[in-house]
C-alpha cells in the first residue's frame, strides 16, 4: 500500500514538473483574464463532475480572494444554479446547460474558462460555441490531447497528462496560478 502511495505522489510530482512547459500559455491566459477584468468584464467557468467543482472553486477565488486582500472580482461558476441546470437540462437537453447561461450572461470582452479533462464534453463545447457567438474569449483547460476543445478555444492549456486524476490536480494548480497572476497584476 505504501508503494502505491509513493508511486501516486511521484506521478503527480512528475506531472507538475512538466506543467512548467505550459508557462507561456498560462501567462497568456492570465493576461487575457486581467485585461477583461480591467475593462469591466467577468470570468465565467464551466465543467462537469470534478471540473464543475474546480469551476466553483476558481470563481470563489475571484469573488472572495486568493492571496491578497482586494476588492471582489466578477467570477461566475455556471455549475451552481440547480434550478437553471435542471430546467435547461429538462427543456433543452444536458448539452445546453452551460450554453444557455453563456448566451444570457456573456458580453463581448468577457472570458469563459472551460474545463474538460478529455476536451470533448458536449455541453462544454456548446458553451464555447455560445461564447464565440457573444464575443467572449475562451480559455480551455484540458488534458494532453486537447480533444475537440483544442480546435475551438482561443487559448487551450493542455496539461501534460492523459489520466483524469492528474489532469484535475493540474487544472486546479493552473487555476491557482491564474488567480495569483491576476491578483498581482490588478493589485500592484
Curated annotation (Swiss-Prot):
Q: What's its EC?
A: 5.3.1.28
Q: Which GO terms describe its biological process?
A: carbohydrate metabolic process; D-glycero-D-manno-heptose 7-phosphate biosynthetic process
What reactions does this protein catalyze?
2 D-sedoheptulose 7-phosphate = D-glycero-alpha-D-manno-heptose 7-phosphate + D-glycero-beta-D-manno-heptose 7-phosphate
Supply the PROSITE patterns for this chain. Answer: SIS
Pathway(s) where this gene product acts: Carbohydrate biosynthesis; D-glycero-D-manno-heptose 7-phosphate biosynthesis; D-glycero-alpha-D-manno-heptose 7-phosphate and D-glycero-beta-D-manno-heptose 7-phosphate from sedoheptulose 7-phosphate: step 1/1
The alphabetized UniProt keywords are: Carbohydrate metabolism, Cytoplasm, Isomerase, Metal-binding, Zinc
Pfam family membership, one: SIS_2
Q: Name one GO molecular function term.
A: D-sedoheptulose 7-phosphate isomerase activity
Report the subcellular localization: Cytoplasm
Free-text cofactor note: Binds 1 zinc ion per subunit.
Q: Which Gene3D superfamilies match?
A: Glucose-6-phosphate isomerase like protein, domain 1
Q: Which domain of life is it from?
A: Bacteria
PANTHER family hit by this protein: DNAA INITIATOR-ASSOCIATING PROTEIN DIAA (PTHR30390:SF6), SEDOHEPTULOSE 7-PHOSPHATE ISOMERASE / DNAA INITIATOR-ASSOCIATING FACTOR FOR REPLICATION INITIATION (PTHR30390)
Give additional notes from the record: The reaction produces a racemic mixture of D-glycero-alpha-D-manno-heptose 7-phosphate and D-glycero-beta-D-manno-heptose 7-phosphate.
The subunit structure is:
Homotetramer.
HAMAP family membership: GmhA
Function field: Catalyzes the isomerization of sedoheptulose 7-phosphate in D-glycero-D-manno-heptose 7-phosphate.
Question: What name is this protein filed under?
Answer: Phosphoheptose isomerase
Q: Organism source for this protein?
A: Rhodospirillum rubrum (strain ATCC 11170 / ATH 1.1.1 / DSM 467 / LMG 4362 / NCIMB 8255 / S1)
